[in-house]
């Protein structure tokens, strides 16, 4: 930081409301810094609070504000650090917060917790923490991101499933191996290399190597991958199918040693949803921020596909268990720190009444998730026989309002 003669004579407070989190435009952060510097050219500045909510269970390769993914949190912190380091009048900064902490009034992905920490409640190291450690630590270091994501799933048309893996290091390039095979050499940008890694079904060992100031650095992680076929011509996976609706998020469930995958549209011979739109709350943010009662797996129920016509899976003949997950969604009350996330008009989607028909048989009649309570997890388990090549065809027939589905699981008996 450049020294300014009058830096500590007069304190100045600047309105920074976590641009890119509570405010939608992340680039407004550096615009405000430059604007303040133009008004106070002889004084240095400190950014005393910034952060984004991160749930270590949630991941997305299409990260967006308020999805609580590790990937959006990393994107946010990389941007802030880069922009502050560009400006010699920024004397320092303070991340909000070192670790997650309890906050009773909050909903979000982890209710009653402020998840802006770069460490979890259990002090697990989120990707943002590893990034700062590699960029600001005294000793040369390299860290592979996604350390918390032990159980993963990915759709593929081959025996391999490619997934981007971040590597953090103060070097120009990184060599990455998977299962002792060279994946490639990847260039870094802002201290992050994104390696496209080919995973196989089962346990995979990923290793990364680089050189920092003449010192060799490396790291390794173990990933348990379930490669889910895009079609079931060769059989249905014994580990089943677990799909969340209305988002591009993955959610790891360590208790069940599995990973929920994001939805995809149905293709002939494969599986997926038919019709509908993604539920977005006022302010165009993903899903709801309400505390979902009756579960600790809130992210599964906080997103939703509305006006869905069907979910189809062209599975082999046999007996299957279909588990449908629903929640009647309504926005949580607007909080003073997050007014921009709520529009003037509240959405009320509690009037959603419909029938569910599976392979021509009505299994739920005049179903309304709101009958069980608003923002409450509702689970319906159905046994069905797929025969004569018909596969599984779950139809949602509207009676009043919109049909909807939050998540679906399919197992073969």
Regions found by a protein language model. Give the residues of each.
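Generic beta-strand/beta-sheet core signal
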Residues: 6-7, 48, 96, 168-170, ...
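Substrate-binding/catalytic cleft of secreted carbohydrate-active enzymes
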Residues: 1-124, 128, 132, 141, ...
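Short, glycine-/Ser/Thr-/acidic-enriched flexible segments
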Residues: 9-11, 52-53, 100, 125, ...
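Carbohydrate-binding surfaces of carbohydrate-active enzymes
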Residues: 83-239
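Compositionally biased, intrinsically disordered or flexible polar/acidic segments
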Residues: 228-413
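Generic recognition of flexible, low-complexity loop/linker segments
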Residues: 33-35, 80-83, 151-154, 162-165, ...
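A structural signal for short secondary-structure junctions
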Residues: 38-40, 87-88, 158-160, 168-170, ...
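A short acidic/small-residue loop/turn micro-motif
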Residues: 12, 184, 190, 364-366, ...
């Amino acid at each position: 930081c450049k020294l300014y003669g009058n830096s500590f004579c007069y304190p100045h407070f600047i309105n920074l409301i976590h641009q890119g989190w509570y405010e939608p435009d992340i680039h407004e952060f550096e615009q405000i810094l430059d604007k303040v510097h133009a008004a106070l050219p002889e004084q240095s500045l400190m950014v005393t609070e910034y952060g984004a909510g991160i749930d270590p269970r949630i991941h997305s390769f299409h990260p967006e504000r308020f999805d609580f993914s590790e990937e959006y949190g990393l994107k946010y912190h990389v941007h802030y650090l880069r922009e502050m380091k560009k400006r010699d009048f920024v004397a320092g900064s303070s991340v909000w917060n070192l670790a997650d902490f309890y906050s009773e009034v909050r909903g979000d992905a982890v209710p009653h917790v402020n998840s802006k920490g770069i460490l979890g409640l259990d002090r697990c190291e989120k990707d943002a923490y590893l990034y700062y450690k590699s960029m600001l630590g005294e000793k040369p270091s390299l860290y592979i991101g996604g350390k918390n994501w032990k159980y993963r799933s990915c759709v593929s048309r081959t025996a391999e499933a490619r997934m981007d893996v971040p590597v953090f290091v103060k070097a120009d390039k990184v060599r990455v191996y998977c299962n002792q095979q060279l994946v490639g050499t990847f260039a870094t940008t802002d201290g992050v290399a994104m390696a496209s890694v080919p995973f196989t079904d089962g346990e995979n060992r990923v290793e990364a190597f680089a050189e920092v100031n003449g010192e060799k650095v490396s790291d390794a992680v173990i990933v348990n991958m379930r490669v889910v076929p895009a079609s079931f011509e060769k059989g249905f996976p014994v580990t089943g199918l677990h799909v969340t609706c209305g988002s591009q998020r993955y959610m790891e469930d360590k208790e069940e040693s599995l990973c929920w995958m994001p939805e995809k549209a149905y293709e002939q011979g494969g599986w997926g949803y038919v019709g509908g739109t993604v539920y977005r709350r006022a302010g165009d943010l993903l899903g709801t921020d309400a505390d979902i009662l009756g579960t600790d797996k809130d992210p599964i129920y906080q997103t939703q596909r509305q006006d869905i016509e069907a979910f189809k899976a062209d599975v082999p003949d046999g007996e299957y268990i279909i588990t449908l997950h629903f929640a009647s969604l309504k926005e949580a009350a607007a909080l003073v720190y997050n007014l921009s996330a709520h529009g003037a008009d509240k959405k009320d989607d509690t009037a959603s009444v419909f029938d569910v028909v599976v392979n021509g048989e009505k299994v739920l009649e005049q179903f309304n998730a709101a009958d069980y309570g608003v923002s409450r997890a509702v689970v319906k388990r159905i046994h069905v026989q797929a025969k004569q090549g018909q596969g599984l065809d779950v139809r949602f027939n509207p009676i009043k309002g919109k049909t909807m589905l939050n998540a679906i699981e399919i197992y073969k008996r």
